[in-house]
């Protein structure tokens, strides 16, 4: 099926364009905010393709696409390089932090087996012929970002037709091998599996990221999933980075734009596709910087949602004192919808590491709120009063309140039959204990 698709697309191309000499070519490295005089020393990309000698047609296409025709052992492709200087910001995030020390002690929140080192990181984003993946989907544009001497370097690799896929993938693999940590956004489920499968099918030895692939999407969800409508990259740019793109194209349009490009080889909207991909790389770099700053000093004032998310991650990493500080800071921002969750986490944390006596005050506070529909603090209080204090009447009172709440919410999970059965069993046990005590003491 893939071969038929390739043949069909080549036929459409040849009918619209006599030969490959009319294919889009660009030239050079672009530095944001700099003229051509400042571009004489582009960042070196290893063996990621040698530039072909420019010709008049290539120079003509420089302003239309901005790339360079590069050659590899098995053919040619288009390569474009852009540098974001360290003096620049993406949204409200200064990029100089890319080379800063905020990445030390980062393994506990990245969940990798090592700390992040800026020089080891490579950012990856792909643009593909389909959004659903599958055997017929090809990555026609691969963007890679990494830390260079002058700033964030964004290398983009574009295939103008399917016969340029192998040399393009070889160049991409050469650049990837220069780094030891891969950073993507939703790349664990889409970008990298797709690229890896295309490398294998093309005979390019793939790279294996053993516990060295950081997907920023789960990190974002842990911090802001409860506050934002979604955690797409576009939402994070607007709400977190304060970056608003102008003249951007929706990602859903990109496959059709590329198919049109294959037919005509006219640049058209392909320049916007390259810009979209470049912005995605820059956004990932800015997000990583922001994550590192947030987690580098987690006890600094944050908003309630961030404090709750950081506290959970600290708790997971067994950094209990810092987790408690984050939860208490979140609670101090009351009234706020996240305060309840922080109190719940703090109560369980206190019970586990300091004992139930210390947690009683938090449970009593949660259960005593006017209009509270929380049953879990009542159950925890009942457990403590029954098993530790032997206060059976007090435990029974808490259990009765929990039963009334469960009956009120019988149509929801909070009033499930299992919960009601457990509460009724607890009540029966407490009443039996009280009866035996009365018989014993008369």
Predicted segment positions?
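Conserved DEDDh/DEDDy metal-dependent 3′-5′ exonuclease domain
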Residues: 149-239
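Residue at a conserved register position within TPR or TPR-like alpha-solenoid repeats
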Residues: 314, 349-350, 385-386, 431
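Structural register within alpha-helical repeat arrays
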Residues: 310, 345-346, 381, 395, ...
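Conserved RNase H-like, two-metal-ion catalytic cores of nucleic-acid enzymes
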Residues: 109-181
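Acidic, Mg2+-coordinating catalytic module of metal-dependent nucleases/exonucleases
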Residues: 222, 228-301, 308
């Amino acid at each position: 099926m893939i071969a038929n698709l390739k043949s069909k697309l080549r036929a459409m191309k040849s009918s619209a364009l006599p030969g490959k000499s009319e294919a889009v070519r660009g030239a050079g490295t672009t530095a944001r905010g700099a003229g051509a005089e400042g571009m004489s020393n582009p960042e070196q990309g290893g063996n990621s393709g040698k530039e072909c000698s420019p010709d008049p047609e290539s120079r003509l296409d420089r302003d239309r696409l901005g790339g360079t025709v590069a050659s590899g052992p098995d053919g040619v492709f288009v390569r474009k390089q852009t540098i974001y200087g360290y003096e620049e910001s993406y949204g409200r995030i200064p990029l100089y932090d890319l080379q800063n020390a905020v990445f030390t002690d980062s393994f506990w929140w990245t969940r990798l087996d090592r700390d992040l080192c800026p020089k080891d990181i490579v950012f990856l984003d792909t643009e593909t012929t389909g959004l659903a993946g599958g055997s017929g989907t090809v990555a026609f544009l691969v963007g890679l970002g990494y830390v260079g001497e002058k700033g964030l370097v964004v290398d983009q690799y574009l295939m103008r037709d399917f016969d340029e896929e192998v040399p393009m993938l070889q160049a991409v693999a050469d650049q990837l091998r220069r780094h030891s940590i891969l950073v993507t956004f939703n790349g664990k489920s889409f970008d990298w599996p797709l690229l890896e499968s295309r490398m294998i099918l093309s005979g390019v030895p793939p790279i294996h990221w053993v516990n060295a692939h950081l997907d920023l999407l789960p990190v974002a969800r842990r911090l802001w999933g409860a506050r934002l409508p979604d955690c797409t990259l576009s939402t994070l740019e607007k709400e977190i980075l304060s970056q608003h793109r102008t003249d951007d194209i929706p990602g859903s349009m990109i496959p059709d734009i590329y198919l049109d490009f294959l037919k005509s080889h006219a640049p058209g909207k392909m320049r916007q596709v390259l810009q979209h991909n470049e912005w995605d790389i820059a956004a990932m770099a800015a997000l990583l910087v922001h994550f590192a700053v947030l987690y580098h000093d987690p006890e600094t004032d944050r908003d309630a949602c961030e404090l709750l998310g950081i506290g959970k991650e600290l708790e997971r990493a067994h950094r209990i004192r810092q987790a408690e500080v984050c939860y208490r800071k979140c609670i101090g921002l009351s009234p706020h919808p996240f305060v309840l969750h922080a109190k719940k986490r703090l109560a369980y944390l206190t019970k586990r590491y300091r004992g139930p006596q210390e947690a009683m005050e938090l449970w009593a506070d949660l259960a005593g709120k006017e209009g509270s529909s929380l049953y879990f603090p009542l159950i925890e209080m009942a457990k403590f009063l029954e098993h530790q204090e032997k206060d059976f009447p007090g435990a029974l009172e808490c259990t009765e309140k929990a039963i009334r709440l469960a009956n009120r919410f019988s149509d929801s999970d909070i009033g499930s039959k299992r919960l009601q059965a457990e509460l009724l069993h607890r009540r029966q046990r407490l009443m039996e204990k009280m009866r035996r005590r009365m018989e014993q003491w008369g």
